[in-house]
Amino acid sequence: MAAFALLFVAPSCESDDTDFSQIIADHDTVSIRNIQFNDAEVEDSAEQIPTDIADEYFDDYIENQDLNRVVNIAFNGEDATVSGDLTRCRILRNGAHLTVYITGKKVYLKVSGSTRNGSIKVYGENKFGIELCNASIHNPHGAAINSQNKKRMYVVLAEGSRNVISDGADYIDTEGEAQKATIFSEGKIIVSGKGMLQVDAQARAGIASDDYVRLRPGVHTQIISHGTHCIRANDGVMIDGGVHNLETFGNAARGIRCEAFVKMKSGRTTVITHGASVIEDIDTTGAAAVKADSIVVVSGGELRLKSTGEGGKGINAADYVQTGGTVMVVTLGENGLSSPKGVKSDSRITIEGGSFYSYSVNSYAIEGTLVLKPGAKKHLTAKRYHIVEY
C-alpha cells in the first residue's frame, strides 16, 4: 500500500509533520482563476454500458430497455395534441396541462412544441421515457415535468435539440404530492442524448429526484435557479460526462445538493452560487457549489466551482476524494454568519491524482485532514490557496 502524507488544515490550527519541500507560501505567485460558464464541446471519456442484467446500474441505461410504445405530445400554446400508441397509458388534458396515467410497460413519450401555460404530470408504476424534441414548457404554477412515479424516468434530449423547461414563482401544490423542482421525479432521473436542456427555476430547484440523478455523456445542461438548488437528489448525483452550467442566486442554496454522494467521472461541470448564509432554527447554513452529506468523488473531467456570497463554499462534504480530473474552486464571499471555504470536509480531503486548485479570498482554501498521495509535481499552499498537481 502506498504511503500517504497527512496535513490537517483548520481555522484554529495548522500542523505538518511531513517535509513538504515543494511548499511555497508566497501569495504573489498565485492568481485567482476566472470561473465562468463554458458552452464549448468537451471530449467525454468512453462510457461503459453494463451488459450484465445483474449489474446494479444495468437499468440506468435506456439502451438496455425496450421502450417502444411511443406516444407523441405536441404543445401548441394553450393546447396540446396527443397521438401514437395509447394502449398502455391514458392522458387527460386541461388546456396544455397533461396528466399521463401509465398502465403498462415500455411507454415512451416524445414531446415537442411550445407552451407558456402547460405541464406534464405522470402517474404509474413502470419506468418510462420522455424524449424532448425542441420542447419549450412553462408552468406558471408548478413543476413543468412532474413524475409521481417511483420508477426510473429516462429524459432523452433529441440530437441537436434545444429544450427550455421553466416554472413560475407561484406554486399551487396538491395535497400529498411533492413537486420539489421544475423537473421533479419521485424516482430516479437519468438524462441522456446529444441535445441541450435549459432549466429556468424561479421558486424551487431546477432538477430534483427523491432517488438519484444521473447525467450521461453528451448531455448539455444549463440550469439557473433563483429560489434554491440547481440539482437536488436524496440518494446520489452521478455526472458521467457532458457539459453542465449551473447557477443559483438563492440564499443558502447549492448548485448540487445531495443527501448522499456526488460522483464525477467525465465532462465539464461549472457551478456558480451567489447566495448568502442564513439562520435556520438555531443553525447557520450557507450556500455551496456542491454539498454532499456523505462523499464527493472526482475521478475525471473538469469541475469548476465559484461561490460569491457571504460564507459561501465551493465543496462542503463529509469526505472528499480525488483520483483524477481537474478541480478548480474559488470563493469570493466575506465572513459573516458563516465562514467561506474553498473545500470543507468533516473528515478527509484525499488527493491521489489530477489537478486541484482552491482559492478563498477571505478565509481558508481548505478545511479538513489533507491526505496526499506521494509523487505530486506541484504542491503550493498558504492560508488562502492550495494547489496540487500530479
Placement of each model-derived feature along the sequence:
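A composition-driven surface/loop motif
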Residues: 14-390
